[in-house]
Amino acid sequence: MLRESFHPEPTKILPDPDSLVRKFVRPGMYLHLANTMSRPNALIYALARVFGGTKPDFTISVAGLHSSAHALALSQIVKKVITGFAGDNYPKPGPNSLYQDLLMGKPFELELWSLLTLIQRLMAGAMRLPGIITNSLIGSDLIADKLGKSAFLYNKPLSGNPFGPAPEPHLSTENKGSRNKDIVFLLPLNPEITLVHGVVADEDGNIVLCPPSGEGPWGALAAQKGVIATVEKIVPRGALPPELVVIPGGKVLGITVAKFGAHPQSLRVHGLQDLPAFEGVETYMDDYEFQKEANQSAGIPAKADRWYKEFVSLAGGHSEYLEQLGSVRLRRLTMTPPEHNLRVPEDPKTVNDSEQMIILAARAIMEKIKTHSYKTILAGIGAAHMAAWTASKLLEKDGIKISVVSELGFYGMKPFRGDVFLFSQLHTKECSMLSDVPSILGTIVPDECLGVIGAAEVDWFGNINSVIDSNGKFLVGSGGANDIVSTSNTIVVAKANRHRFVRNVKHVTSPGERVVEAVCQFGRFKRQEFSNHPFELASWIPPSSDEEMETWEAVRRYTQWLPPDEDIPTPAEPPITVSELTILRELDPERIYTEQFMVYTHLP
């Protein structure tokens, strides 16, 4: 007798995001929110509307919680979040008071990973593997609460021993692992349903995503039950070029049209407007004003309540949301603004501490590129990426081309002057490649890449903290920082004060083995990678805010590190030049990163 064959139900097309959520999502589910550069924000709002006030106790995994995703906490629908970042990422990265008690389980339980390890677990889940090996987490406090549960340390295998080495005592006594002895094995993640916002889908549920694609399709492919998705447009069967389909219809439970379904985040459309499938679908940019309002409102109960009522708990759902935003605002998001140009050279005598720090970091990057065989620069968000951009432009003047990359999939980026957001779609225009997080953090960064990142705290052995402040409050998490320092030599860019340049960090979010330089407003501290030596001040320039300050005085006033020997003069940095300052200010005309005392001022 022939076995009855299994035919999955056809993808259902529903009228709106709320209907999609009602049809497929049930209380208590584990849901994943795909961070593809176009987070499914219309579906996040729909979750809040449909389940708000019902205590559904969802477990949510998502690469980052910021801006409109604050609705998850405000709606009280989440029991636990698995993430790599929670806070604000625009206009500058920093904590949001909505999450200050996260480490105490409020407003939900937290399971904190690095960006790459979260996606690697989804990759293992998608491939139905028992687990995956990672270069990240070893030596950091991020691994401590996961050992024996979702992360496991094993001795590195030895050639000629088919059964592997015998366990060693350090595996039970060193709770962070040792890079030269151990490997980390991570268990897979398999959400029940993954929520996606795509560019276009056909009536069978085949979905097109467009790079740079963040986590890519992995969260969708890891889903046990399948995917529910909003898209900008649904086209007939057979209308999509198969080479553009990223998520196959067999994985998709239901779809609906939600124009601007990623708002306030951006969506990029392939440059294929001549294809009928893409007709009427336009790239749109991040809505920075909306993101700022969401971030500023979230941590203040009265403002948060007003914001939530105005944009989330709308009886008319997504259609009413678009009406609230207005057609003029939405149309403006589809337009490319003019690039900023400075016609008059800047006077270096007007440089401030923030600008001086960024320029010193740019010099550090240039020196490393000229003296080592680095192929790329990984720009972490913040003053770090401003330094990387400035360095790349200065290197170009010297006839040296170096590719700047960022973790969400930008390769060979040339910044659009005037837009300082690291992940703006405007920076894709001249990229040489657009890819995803596994490609950048998993393959480009380990291959002769120079990392440049920020820090809330850095100690004199290079260890970095971005998780907990001096009062026990939550900061932001690792993001991709742990993944970067785990495989590449790294420069830290941070304005020095005694609460930031410390003897011992409160949480080793990113271990300091490969952190080779710390740059601040008055100089550059250096150390050798994989050494036991602390940072030493290697070059010096008086802070612009106090040009009479002595070297030893600056180190004692702004750090908890040992000052240099007064009998051995510290090499002086050359004065800031017209070219350096003009390039930097041209990149940041609104002075978001270059205003005096404005770099990470709200971190401890």
Summary of predicted features, one role per range:
Residues 8-22, 38-50, 68-80, 84-346, ...:
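Conserved phosphate- and dinucleotide-binding cores of soluble alpha/beta proteins
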